[in-house]
Amino acid sequence: MKCDMHVHTIHSGMCTIPGMSRFCRESYNHPEALYESLKSQGMDLVTVTDHDSIDAVEALRSRPDFFLSEEVTCHLPGGTEIHVGVYDLNDRQHIEIQRRASDFLSLHAYLNEQELLYSANHIFSGLTGRRSAEDFRWFENAFPAIEARNGCMLERSNRAAADFTRRTGKVPIGGSDAHAMKSVGSCWTEVKDARDKQEFLAGVRLGLGEARGASGSFWKLTRDVLWIGCQMIRERPATLPMIFLSPAAPVITLVNYILEVRFVNKWTPRVLPPLCDGQLIAEPVVEEVAA
């Protein structure tokens, strides 16, 4: 069975880019259209991981192959921001998760108490800001799963995440992280021989899942940014004059590409140092962090 375990809809809130948060959404994917797109691409199960929201559930709750998830924004004890994927939760759990989101240790305790599956997402990306060496110790010791393949991250970022996942013995998660419809289903998690949602999620927990699909790129991100801009204008015609800014989109995404390359090049040798023959060492290289 296959499932894109990281995907966004119109319920992911407003864009976090300065100056755009008042009129541009993070995503313009409508839940029903998202569902149909994922099914047409061969996904056996469907979930939605909106930012700190489960509002998409109202449109999809009746679907037997749907399960509820979310992407929680929180801060590690050192102050750095991370995104945590939480899978197969219910409405009550969502409320408590959001109540605890400002306190990572409290959130971590609750996720374990409820026996929820959760992952640290896009850990070799500067998407959420600065990173510290301590963060990677938390990723090793406080998370059962790591997002090993993300359809919006560069291939080198995904390779580093997959290597970290293998070294630390974590459960691999794969998802498109699609904010634009054309990227939906580009990455997924696959559990062979699973026959239903319960068997799929049990297989993921046991580490039987595989993170598969295509990584992101400069061109893919540029396409998605332009698509989101078009949807913004369609929803808010008053923003039409901003269409003259569209030639700047490749410049913005090029800057993002350069920053992402610098980010992964900085942290990969620190967290995943190679041996003399170029092969990555198998055992964890990160110190233990007390819970």
Predicted regions, residues:
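A short acidic, glycine/proline-enriched capping/turn motif at secondary-structure boundaries
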Residues: 53-54, 72-75, 90-94, 125-126
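Domain-core and long-helix interface of multi-subunit machines
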Residues: 3-22, 91-186, 214-222, 253, ...
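A conserved mid-domain beta-alpha-beta active-site/ligand-binding segment of alpha/beta enzyme cores
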Residues: 194-246
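Short, hinge-like loop/turn segments at secondary-structure boundaries
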Residues: 64-66, 84-87, 136-139, 189-193
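A hydrophobic membrane-anchoring feature enriched in long, contiguous, low-charge segments
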Residues: 229, 233-265, 269
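Short, charged, surface-exposed secondary-structure boundary motifs
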Residues: 75-84, 155-158, 183-185, 200-205
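An N-terminally biased module of ancient metal coordination in phosphate/nucleic-acid-related enzymes
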Residues: 1-81, 141, 182, 270-291
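A basic- and aromatic-enriched beta-loop-alpha substructure that forms the phosphate/nucleotide-
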Residues: 80-94
